[in-house]
Amino acid sequence: MSSKPEPKDIHQPNGTGPTPSPCSSDGPGREPLAGTSEFLGPDGVEVVVIESRANAKGIREEDALLENGSQSNESDDVSTDRGPAPPSPLKETSFSIGLQVLFPFLLAGFGTVAAGMVLDIVQHWEVFQKVTEVFILVPALLGLKGNLEMTLASRLSTAANIGQMDTPKELWRMITGNMALIQVQATVVGFLASIAAVVFGWIPDGHFSIPHAFLLCASSVATAFIASLVLGMIMIGVIIGSRKIGINPDNVATPIAASLGDLITLALLSGISWGLYLELKHWRYIYPLVCAFFVALLPVWVVLARRSPATREVLYSGWEPVIIAMAISSVGGLILDKTVSDPNFAGMAVFTPVINGVGGNLVAVQASRISTFLHMNGMPGENSEPTPRRCPSPCTTFFSPDVNSRSARVLFLLVVPGHLVFLYTISCMQGGHTTLTLIFIIFYMTAALLQVLILLYIADWMVHWMWGRGLDPDNFSIPYLTALGDLLGTGLLALSFHVLWLIGDRDTDVGD
């Protein structure tokens, strides 16, 4: 019969490779192969066909995950190309996770140390003394690395891991769309952060200055725009390079985003605000002109972001987490403003970027890894787990045998040795205004451990919760988590300094 070879041609490309069976030689039993419900052979044959399809499917998925550039060009249906229980995205041990995370973590930490040293110096500048609302901008703008750059890194890492950046055309579309998107977000968030700084500075004191408000707006928007442009380009290079040398971008992209993010952003904020402050007495019209220039560029970035399907949805629906995260970080900025403005707590400035940066870096790595794991198994809104996930217990988050729990343990264990290295570096550089006594280190480490413990637990719950409601965690979870890291870090550090002051540890002259 002419229809005999057709079933073979259909099954062989899918990897089934059928072997001869009693039924295959039976002519009448072959015709119904198009529909298994009419198959006349024994049940065992039907099971073998189904299992071989699943196995071939699993092989294709694992090859796509573990080999660089091995994505098939076949236009398989995504909905049917996933098995019910696909393998883990990456075969990683605790040692391999720690080895890949360690160097970027230390690099990011030294970046936060440098940012802390910068903040420790610029807090004595006239612009920070006269316009103290600039302190409120610090966590909000440093948080842009969580709102924008880390979200960008997580999106691109996921896209690279699932093969959406394998061809030059896909790569270029992903780059242009995402760069335009973060410029739109940076401009809007910078403007809103300045409004929050003005409001938070006006409410406690009841004092409002229009020139200072324009200064904050121009400084915030210019800093956000330039920092996002520079860091976005760095992130793209890091992710492309990671894929080429066989490193999981999830482990390195987000920490490297933060390694230079804090330093570049804080240096830009200090330099721009100082330069604009010098013009306050001579040419006040420069402030509205700076704001108008960056606002005029918005339509260009919007058009470019709308052209890419990967960023079009985020352009319309991705504002809520970014804006709320900015507001949360601004509350942390208010705490920083009220604490650092007190000469008794001047030593807090150098440690704030460090504790906030380390906590945000670690939780961003974990959120990006969980998000990639979920993307490997389905699409947002699909429940790939046998039982629906509720609020997890701490034991499930930190002590279960799965790869995400393993990475949570590794990241948590990095906190103490990492902070000890960073504190020692600050001490060697004669930074800060606080002597690193044993009691101070104990209080500082307690605050850092508590911050990361809470963040990792919230990340485990939040990423799965957003996934179950059809929200992409790459776009929604990291802004919330890094903003919470800023708030928790600043709040716990301020509490530690107040307790140390109450019990008699009142060093404020170190580094003067």
From Swiss-Prot:
PTM note: Phosphorylated.
Biased composition (Polar residues): 13-24
SUPFAM superfamilies listed in its UniProt record: MgtE membrane domain-like (SSF161093)
Parts of the chain that traverse the membrane: 101-121, 184-204, 221-241, 256-276, 285-305, 315-335, 345-365, 410-430, 438-458, 483-503
Keywords: Cell membrane, Ion transport, Magnesium, Membrane, Phosphoprotein, Repeat, Transmembrane, Transmembrane helix, Transport
InterPro entries xrefs: SLC41_membr_dom, SLC41_membr_dom_sf, SLC41A1-3
Any one Gene Ontology cellular component term annotated for this protein: basolateral plasma membrane
Gene3D superfamilies per the UniProt record, alphabetical: SLC41 divalent cation transporters, integral membrane domain (1.10.357.20)
Main localization, broad class: membrane
PANTHER family to which the protein is assigned, alphabetical: DIVALENT CATION TRANSPORTER SOLUTE CARRIER FAMILY 41, SOLUTE CARRIER FAMILY 41 MEMBER 1
Name assigned to this protein: Solute carrier family 41 member 1
Species, as recorded: Mus musculus
Gene: Slc41a1
